[in-house]
Swiss-Prot record:
Family matches, as InterPro entries: Restrct_endonuc-II-like, tRNA_endonuc-like_dom_sf, UPF0102_YraN-like
Species in which this protein is naturally found: Synechococcus sp. (strain CC9902)
Pfam family, one: UPF0102
Family assignment from sequence similarity: Belongs to the UPF0102 family.
Name used for this protein in its record: UPF0102 protein Syncc9902_1284
PANTHER family on file: UPF0102 PROTEIN YRAN
NCBIfam families per UniProt: PRK14689.1 (NF011281)
GO MF, one example: nucleic acid binding
């Protein structure tokens, strides 16, 4: 595994653990189709949560991962969500929320910034 893959896995695990403590149940992790990948898909009550995770260290200068979530990435994410829902028709009626988790991996105190995504395309 590359250093970036290790950082990405660590950031996803941190985001997942925080959400799990709040009662979210993991449905899929790193689910992929030809349109893209979904980092985390979780469920709580009758709600679905799709989380795009960006893990960064202090050396990166892309606003903590926010710059990496550009319009092309948002379109790919929207297509991947539609693909996931077509493979999980029982989840089609549930309210869907998409969030971006910006995980700061520098230092001993990990910080996560959560941003709700209201429009993907």
């Amino acid at each position: 595994m590359t250093k970036q893959q290790i950082q990405g896995d660590r950031a996803e695990e941190i985001a997942f653990q925080l959400l799990q403590r709040k009662g979210w149940v993991l449905l899929d992790r790193n689910w992929s189709c030809r349109w893209g990948e979904l980092d985390l898909v979780l469920q709580k009550d009758q709600r679905l949560l799709v989380v795009e995770v960006k893990g960064r260290t202090a050396q990166r200068h892309d606003r903590g991962g926010l710059d990496a979530f550009h319009s092309h990435k948002r379109r790919r994410l929207a297509r991947a969500i539609n693909c996931w829902r077509s493979h999980h028709p029982d989840a089609g009626h549930q309210l869907l929320q998409v969030v971006l988790a910006l995980v700061n991996l520098s230092g001993s105190a990990t910080r996560v910034r959560w941003l709700a995504i209201h429009q993907l395309s």
